[in-house]
Amino acid sequence: MKLFTQNDRYFGLLDSCTHIFCITCINIWHKTRRETGASDNCPICRTRFRNITMSKFYKLVN
C-alpha cells in the first residue's frame, strides 16, 4: 500500500467511502448540512457516513 501526502495539507477521510476531501472544506460542508437538518452523506457518492477522520496521509484506491 502506498500512502500519499501533500506538503502541510490535511485531508478529511469519511468512514463510509473512499472519497478524499480538504479537511477544512468537508468540515464547513458538514457543519452547513447539520445546521439545515440534512443527513450526513458523502457529497460525491451520497453514501451515509458517521465520522470524518483528519489525516495527513491518504491512499489511492483503484
Swiss-Prot record:
PROSITE patterns reported for this sequence: ZF_RING_1, ZF_RING_2
One MF term in the entry's GO annotations: ligase activity
Keywords: Ligase, Metal-binding, Ubl conjugation pathway, Zinc, Zinc-finger
Keyword Metal-binding: yes
UniProt-listed SUPFAM superfamilies: RING/U-box
Zinc finger residue ranges, RING-type: 1-46
Residues making up the signal peptide according to the UniProt record: none
Superkingdom assignment: Viruses
Free-text comment on this protein's domains from its UniProt entry: The RING-CH-type zinc finger domain is required for E3 ligase activity.
Note: Encodes the C-terminal region of the E3 ubiquitin ligase p28 protein present in variola virus.
UniProt name for this protein: Zinc finger-containing protein P28b
Higher taxonomy: Viruses, Varidnaviria, Bamfordvirae, Nucleocytoviricota, Pokkesviricetes
